[in-house]
């Protein structure tokens, strides 16, 4: 399940960057990419919940990582909505980078992640 989760959030990040790029250029197919991106939001959340459910003893850091992961998704939507409305995306991008760094750090730090830290 770990590999499915990692694959889903990796694809989600790539789709997000493609959606932002297409939205900025005014491409007509940007809405299709955004809908596929939202499908990957759901897949990532479900695989994350399954991973969280599989842990015998859930510490507070796992809950923090789950919240940070939801924050990443929320920040992605903030960037996309601000871009569509023609508003500044700086706050959304800042939140996205911070949330992504926190989530990746916790994911690599906790026992289910890779052994980098």
Curated annotation (Swiss-Prot):
Which InterPro entries does the protein's record reference? UPF0344 (IPR010899)
Family matches, as Pfam families: DUF1516
* Main localization (coarse): membrane
Where does this protein reside within or beyond the cell? Cell membrane
The source's domain of life comes to: Bacteria
Any idea which UniProt keywords this protein has?
Cell membrane, Membrane, Transmembrane, Transmembrane helix
Keyword Cell membrane attributed: yes
Q: Which GO terms describe its cellular component?
A: plasma membrane
In its keyword annotation, does this UniProt entry include Methyltransferase? no
**Which parts of the chain span the membrane according to its record?**
1-21, 39-59, 61-81, 97-117
Q: Which NCBIfam families does this entry report, sorted A to Z?
A: PRK13673.1-3 (NF010196)
Family, as annotated: Belongs to the UPF0344 family.
Q: Which HAMAP family match?
A: UPF0344
Name of this chain's protein:
UPF0344 protein GTNG_0604
Q: Which organism is it from?
A: Geobacillus thermodenitrificans (strain NG80-2)
**Classification lineage:** Bacteria, Bacillati, Bacillota, Bacilli, Bacillales
